């Protein structure tokens, strides 16, 4: 019989050597409604919960199916209603401030940051820099005092690599 693998030393070194890394499970404590009871239920098993904070959620579908409306509209608005700051990365340069305001999304600097980017490397750097800054300024706070941030990338499918352009 093989000797059981002892992961405790690896886990201890991992968490000691890499600041901010965690091991184990991190179940969501915050959910953001999609604005549709049916879609909420399909995603979370609950009519009132939609997408979980702290997890990656991807909406896929045909052009014109309403993905941008659900995510950039309903989910962004629901997040703002819960005090969550929205970082919206627009890869198609298609988000219209008037449209967002018409569906009650607050586009003020206090509630939302809209960034236009079209390259995978740009989006990776934006997210990396944002997370690095967030950790530097908020990681020492108790979890419940840290500001909550929602990243929306509309749309991942439109991102290009430098070598393609």
Question: Language-model segments: which ranges?
Answer:
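The Walker A/P-loop phosphate-binding site
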Residues: 2-110, 122-132, 136
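Loop/turn-to-beta-strand initiation segments
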Residues: 84-85, 146-150
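Short acidic-hydrophobic, aromatic-tinged amphipathic segments that line or gate anion-handling sites
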Residues: 110-118
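Conserved ATP-binding/catalytic motifs of P-loop helicase motor domains
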Residues: 136-143
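Walker B catalytic acidic pair
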Residues: 155
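Residues immediately C-terminal
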Residues: 158
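Conserved small/polar residues in nucleotide/adenosyl-binding loops
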Residues: 164-165
């Amino acid at each position: 019989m093989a000797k059981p693998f002892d992961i405790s030393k690896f886990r201890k070194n991992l968490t000691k050597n890499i600041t901010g890394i965690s091991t184990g499970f991190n179940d969501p404590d915050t959910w953001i409604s999609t604005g549709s009871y049916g879609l909420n239920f399909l995603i979370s098993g609950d009519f009132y919960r939609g997408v979980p904070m702290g997890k990656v959620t991807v909406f896929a579908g045909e052009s014109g199916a309403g993905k941008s409306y659900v995510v950039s509209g309903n989910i962004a608005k629901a997040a703002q209603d819960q005090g969550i700051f929205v970082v919206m990365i627009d890869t198609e340069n298609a988000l219209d401030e008037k449209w967002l305001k018409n569906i009650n999304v607050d586009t003020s600097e206090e509630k939302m940051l809209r960034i236009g980017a079209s390259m995978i490397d740009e989006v990776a750097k934006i997210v990396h820099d944002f997370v690095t800054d967030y950790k530097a300024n908020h990681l020492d706070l108790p979890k419940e005092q840290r500001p909550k941030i929602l990243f929306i990338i509309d749309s991942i499918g439109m991102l290009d690599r430098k070598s393609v352009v």
